Amino acid sequence: MPGRNPESKPEVKPAAIRPHAKPAVKPSDVIVEEKVEVVQKEEKPVAEKITIGELHLSGCTGCLVTLADTYEGLFKLLDNYADLVYALTLVDVRHVPEMDVCLVEGSCCLDDKLSVEELKEAREKSKVLVAYGGCAAYGNITRFCRGGQWNQPGQEAFVPISEVVDVDLYIPSCPPCPQEVRNVAVMAYLLLRGNEEQKKLATAYLTPLMQLAQRGNEACG
């Protein structure tokens, strides 16, 4: 080509200086964080579950709602400690079965023969009968609904269940605390299914509630 020297060579640029390579990471320099998985171990029941029933008499169903209000506690109770075998509001069972613990809600209407018969049947078929809530234990406001008034000849008489049958435990209050209901059920389980040490623990917890039942309806719920 015109104007180009055939003997001239293209200019060669020097290679760029490479940075110093970083040394490889040694295994000893690597910190591995170990994940520790914490597993909460569920205590296994000591024996087979107990059976629990709920007899509804003259009450507002607030006590049964309290039992359901335990939520996770109720599921744990039913999974590990007790089978609910009778409760007309929750279980489709028409006749009172044999059971370990019967929770009786509401006072007993003396003029309702069916209520009186069901209460007596529950007493015969349960090992532990519990006056569940203020109405069953003391009558509460239903005690003022007594018959015999001349101006109200149709008014019915309502009494605490202890005036009809023998009661083993009282769980007072209106309504009872959900935790108290759950505790009583677990302690009844230990009392009926546990070893000697567990039975002593359950007896110590349940004794005040047994003493309330022995005193009868002299207190106010």
Residue ranges and their predicted role:
Residues P2, K9, K13, I17, ...:
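Iron-sulfur-associated redox domains of electron-transfer enzymes in respiratory
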